């Protein structure tokens, strides 16, 4: 008979646990109590792919879809709370949310196919921490916040503070995003999200731009936020682009300054989907177009 192998023995794979708590506190306890690799499952559209390609091998998966507060969209005094496990397709079915934040809803409805949208959530898209995530520039432009639950209680942070780099977040051990908060819209406000992709649909953004703005009664821009995706290590807020709009009537000159500021903020990479130079140019073009779309909505036209 052949001699037994003499090399180092291969460690046995640990058995993966699957838990489905029904309260946030129970979910946090599970996340905080596991010493090894833990993942939260909301929609699973990113996690399951990562597991199948051996990019992650969790010892514990915590399914949060059975927590009622994470499965609902609630409106109060014009603001919205979106549970972390609410699927993108459900956002489009919420009339009040769609009317108040059409750019955010449009961005969510660009996450993959219709089948993916029936599972993928805004919180999952945010915590996956892809620089090219479609919903994140729209959320950042909207001034959205994330409610984080953890062993030390809850805290609320701007959504742009979650991702720290590709696939990396600022969440501490035992923490999870419980909900996304969208503020009340002032009158004469509008938002929009646009992206460039090589194909007509179901592709990753080469560049994504979210714009949110508010006008006064005379049509002067009083507030604006501009966010860019896929042009840096994470989605970025561009204050200089917003400054190009604030305090003036938005005309061709203001839009040119906006486009220039957006392009100047880019720190992209070269890859098979686009060169640095291409992304920088497209960012300016999309910023202008997204601002024009947001402006039309703010004017009610």
Explain the meaning of each model-derived region.
Residues 5-301:
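C-terminal structural segment of proteins
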């Amino acid at each position: 008979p052949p001699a037994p192998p003499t090399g180092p023995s291969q460690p046995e794979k640990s058995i993966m646990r699957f838990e489905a708590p029904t309260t946030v506190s129970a979910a946090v306890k599970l996340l905080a109590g596991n010493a090894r690799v833990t993942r939260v499952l909301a929609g699973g559209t990113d996690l399951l792919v990562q597991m199948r390609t051996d990019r992650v091998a969790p010892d514990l998966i915590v399914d949060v879809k059975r927590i009622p507060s994470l499965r609902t969209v609630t409106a109060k005094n014009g603001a919205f709370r979106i549970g972390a496990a609410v699927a993108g397709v459900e956002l489009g079915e919420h009339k009040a949310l769609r009317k108040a934040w059409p750019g955010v809803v449009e961005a969510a409805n660009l996450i993959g196919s219709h089948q993916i949208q029936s599972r993928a959530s805004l919180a999952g898209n945010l915590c996956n921490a892809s620089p090219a995530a479609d919903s994140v520039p729209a959320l950042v432009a909207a001034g959205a916040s994330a409610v984080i639950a953890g062993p030390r209680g809850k805290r609320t942070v701007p959504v742009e503070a979650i991702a720290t780099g590709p696939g990396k977040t600022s969440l501490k051990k035992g923490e999870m995003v419980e909900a996304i908060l969208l503020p009340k819209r002032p009158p004469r406000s509008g938002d929009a999200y646009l992206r460039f992709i090589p194909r007509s649909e179901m592709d990753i953004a080469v560049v994504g731009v979210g714009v949110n703005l508010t006008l006064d009664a005379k049509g002067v821009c009083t507030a604006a936020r501009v966010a860019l995706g896929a042009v840096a290590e994470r989605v970025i807020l561009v204050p200089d682009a917003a400054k190009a709009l604030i305090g003036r009537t938005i005309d061709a000159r203001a839009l040119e300054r906006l486009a220039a500021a957006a392009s100047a903020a880019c720190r992209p990479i070269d890859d098979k989907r686009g060169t640095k130079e291409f992304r920088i140019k497209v960012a300016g073009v999309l910023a202008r177009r997204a601002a024009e779309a947001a402006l039309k909505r703010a004017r009610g036209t």
